[in-house]
């Protein structure tokens, strides 16, 4: 037994999609009772009998394993525990430990600092080929708050497994959820359409935890045992997938944890300045009699948007072309404009460009169409379709066949990247709204993908692979002057894309039911959930993807989206104040609100762009209130207000009929953005009036932010 080892170690890693991790100078001390790893003020201690780990910062415990059991693995349904440390060997940045197990054989546990604040722990069970799950248990005091994991408010059953894999709560949102996830179980298996996930959470105790890999897993956040946070993940066939690897990040502040996390998994992409203008789009630009724009017949819905913007004095921004605008099956069979729907595309795009619009278009890794020249036909002939039942390629929301691209196949990646690049190059379209990527993905253990992984490994990996293909297509044409916005995300996806929050409800039951304000409520929470996840730039379909039926919901959502990472206005049905689904149809009050806040978005663009530059280190544009002062416990779960950048405090309204609310001001001094004459001291609650055209916004005293 080695009981006296001291060493200095340096480790330099370059994870996929990440920059080089900074070297960690680590002092390792091994005694008969404890193994200590010291990286400046951060210390990892491993008790030897039985093995128990804890992480400390300046002598204060941030997190520790449960006393009655920490690391574990499962074989044939039986949970096996680790015992005493037999041997300790120095490795770069830390130690490798031989550990007894209750099977009588030896497991290997490696503990090492990747940076001065990132500790990696790896468990390799004995005979790993026979292991079906691995996990960890951590002590959770009752005052701990846990943030992150998903943007979705909570896990709920899907509507019809294998057919409509949508969470029931997404379609009919309940009034549940907040920032704090404590007391929940959260499954790590991406379900559409609120599909920003990561096996990563942050704790109010001052640490973060991220689990490596893409296999399915479960976080039990002190639900089964009020004193324990546990994680359990499946293993897979590859040797590297038959072990548990997780990283602990020492804060204590949330910004530091995000910096460490994104340094490991990949720095988030920051799009060009123009992407922070407001976006205009429709779920469908309808086929019909064209209208004239600059003397050329174009799609009438598009002409209506452009000409009404000019007539009403609404600033130009980003115009997005959603599916269907190209030809064939599902409106997406070939990268070729459907000129029945979209006549004179060159002239149309020139008219938009003259007015200052940038343009984006819909895409997904769906191989549609079985006719000559269709992408589905070509992909199938090349062997690029994902595993599963074979039939003629047919894209459909329900009942489609053979249409998912095998994004693990390098040939398929290159082929699709080049097709996308050719189209955006030809038409100068500088962005893609990347849909799906988590829907209808073959995800069974019997689904073997091109790279040898099973569907249970690929489902969570698909968003990143899909995003990288489209990122590379755009980058090959435009350098860094493009935007990619996606719906699904898992570890590393934000390195390639920014995000929007899925098919959010302005009305229930896929838009067939009654109107609701709970979709807006969920968007307010989801944006902040994403912020804790290392997803710094996020937006939502203003008014709801499923058509709003109450004008107040649209008004309040416009106000909220002005202070979101992305302000995008569109969805199913009409989202135009001059053509409302409510009365009056031509709604002057709504026109004034729409114009006021799209203009304000343009006014605030320099401030937003400056805040966005911090996103490269993981700092979100929208910052949940715990970011403001982690010592002020009134902020721990205050979800209905947030910081927008460093100096604006925003308190959105989501309830229909609400005309007043309270706002809690954190420490410091604050001024009303709308009436800056009065300075208010922080750590107090103020009551504010909120007429329909007003959202409460406060400015940090002394900050320089352009006024309304």
What does each model-identified segment do?
Residues 4-14:
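Bacterial N-terminal signal peptides
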Residues 18-20:
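Boundary at the C-terminal end of the N-terminal hydrophobic targeting segment
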Residues 24-25, 108-110, 186-189, 196-198, ...:
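Generic recognition of flexible, low-complexity loop/linker segments
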Residues 34-275, 279-300, 306-311, 689-707:
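Catalytic and substrate-binding clefts that recognize carbohydrates or anionic sugar/phosphate headgroups
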Residues 41, 123, 200, 309, ...:
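Conserved, mostly hydrophobic/aromatic
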Residues 51, 128, 205-207, 214-216, ...:
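Short, glycine-/Ser/Thr-/acidic-enriched flexible segments
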Residues 150-153, 158, 163-169, 175-176, ...:
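Aromatic- and carboxylate-enriched substrate-binding clefts and catalytic-loop regions
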Residues 308, 351, 355-356, 472-480, ...:
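Carbohydrate-binding surfaces of carbohydrate-active enzymes
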